[in-house]
């Protein structure tokens, strides 16, 4: 799992799935170093808190910061797990280029929630665990600029899978020992 990117619209289940990936990895390999988890929301909120990114500015800086950190982690032999919306071909290419430059294996994962009522319920009921981060409402999510991602290595529907099942599918494609 040297560089795994988990993307999808807000409230699709990215945070829950990433937490499960880390939990399962720790369970299976308690002595190994876990992947470095880079959350674009955390990075972009820190940039807003610092005044370097205005609340009205479109996200983008967070992706470049995360890619730079990912390059350093990969160069030191570490693994990286990125959680981001990853809405456009531009952001998706950034991760491919980051992995390629580091000579790292790359896995792209798109999470979807095909049940609109469930997706809406999640969006309305979730609470941010990032201080200061205002989560988008359902209307913002449905109006978001998000391009289809047919080239993702794995596309998982979180309305049909639990977070643990999705995490197992991801780990199964990119196990820690490099086997498949």
Which positions does each model-derived feature cover?
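Walker A (P-loop) ATP-phosphate-binding motif of ABC ATPase nucleotide-binding domains
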Residues: 3
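The conserved Walker
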Residues: 9-10
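Conserved phosphate-donor/acceptor-positioning beta-strand/loop module used by diverse small-molecule
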Residues: 102-123, 156
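Conserved substrate/cofactor phosphate-moiety recognition/catalytic segment
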Residues: 15-76
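Hydrophobic anchor at the beta1->P-loop junction of P-loop NTPases
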Residues: 6
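Glycine-rich phosphate-binding loop used to anchor ATP phosphates in small-molecule kinases
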Residues: 60-106
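Small-molecule kinase domains that catalyze NTP-dependent phosphoryl transfer to phosphate-bearing small molecules
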Residues: 125-169, 176, 180
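Conserved nucleotide-binding/hydrolysis micro-motifs of P-loop NTPases
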Residues: 42-44, 87, 112-118, 160-162
